[in-house]
Regions:
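Short "lid" loop at the C-terminus of a central beta-strand within the Rossmann-like core
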Residues: 88-90, 144, 183-186
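Class I S-adenosyl-L-methionine
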Residues: 189-240
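Beta-strand cores of modular interaction/reader domains in eukaryotic scaffold and signaling proteins
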Residues: 58-63, 83-84, 138, 178-180, ...
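Intrinsically disordered, low-complexity glycine/charged-rich regulatory or linker segments
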Residues: 1-130, 235-262
Length: 262
């Protein structure tokens, strides 16, 4: 029922121009402008609440271009070793110079310089440089679903699964991660996330204030990677936490559409 309601509202948004939707969204949800980009603010808000970016010696930024998550983490840990992986054939994804020119930041792109986490050679390079070594892994990747918002969960499934596998390869025991996720209505999505969180002592689903209220973006924050994973069934708890954010999203989508109708 929640999925149908959300899909209907997302379909209703397609009746309005992208420019109108952006203006209405900014009017409703954006606070006064700040000098920091939205991605920086999101990780700042996550870190203020959960303290995952402090005292980091080594971290990996997965699918992180243009690099605000990495920038924020390095600002707190100026002497850390930082690694980043991002697509190089998409101008929206490449790391900006202020990130990739830092002496303590190493970009991992693979032999073909693609930075594609689905490429086995890129995965191999990541595992060699970061395997079992990171205090923190940040995974903020997503697939562009413009015009296909109702397929966002399906279109992002493979990427999120790939990121979870890389997180488990790269985190040391006791390490933490921040993983962007979207909807989790499908059985395979919930099962994938259930299997993943069993590798951690604690986990929580969270939407930082700077994440736009009407979209499906949330973050799965996991603490203290275990040497041996649990065998717990977290499906009900995962569904409960997702449902909380579905209801908030419904409320904000209705606000957005009502404003657009004026």
């Amino acid at each position: 029922m929640l999925q149908q309601k959300l899909n209907k509202l997302k379909d209703n948004l397609n009746a309005f121009s992208n420019k109108s939707a952006v203006c209405a969204r900014s009017k409703l949800f954006d606070k006064r402008p700040t000098r920091r980009p939205r991605c920086w603010r999101k990780l700042l808000e996550i870190d203020k609440k959960f303290h995952v970016c402090r005292h980091v010696d080594t971290f990996l930024d997965l699918c992180g271009g243009p690099g605000e998550f990495a920038n924020y983490t390095m600002s707190l840990n100026p002497l850390c070793k930082a690694y980043g992986v991002t697509l190089t054939n998409n101008s929206a994804c490449v790391y900006k110079p202020t990130v990739c020119k830092r002496k303590n930041f190493t970009t991992i792109t693979g032999p073909d310089k693609s930075g594609d986490v689905f490429d086995k050679n890129v995965v191999f390079e990541i595992s060699i440089k970061c395997g079992n070594a990171c205090d923190l892994v940040l995974a903020d990747g997503s697939v562009d679903v413009n015009g296909r918002e109702n397929e966002q969960e399906r279109l992002n499934f493979d990427l999120i699964m790939c990121e979870t596998q890389l997180i488990l390869i790269c985190l040391r025991p006791g390490g933490n991660c921040v993983l962007k996720v979207f909807d989790a209505f499908e059985h395979k999505t919930i099962q994938m996330l259930n299997k993943f969180v069993n590798h951690f002592e604690k986990w929580v689903l969270y939407k930082p204030p700077s994440s736009r209220p009407a979209n499906s973006e949330r973050y799965l924050i996991c603490f203290n990677k275990l040497v041996r994973p649990y065998c717990n069934d977290y499906v009900n708890e995962l569904e409960k936490q997702f449902k909380k954010y579905y209801r908030i999203q419904l409320k904000n989508l209705n606000k957005l559409i009502n404003l657009l109708k004026i």
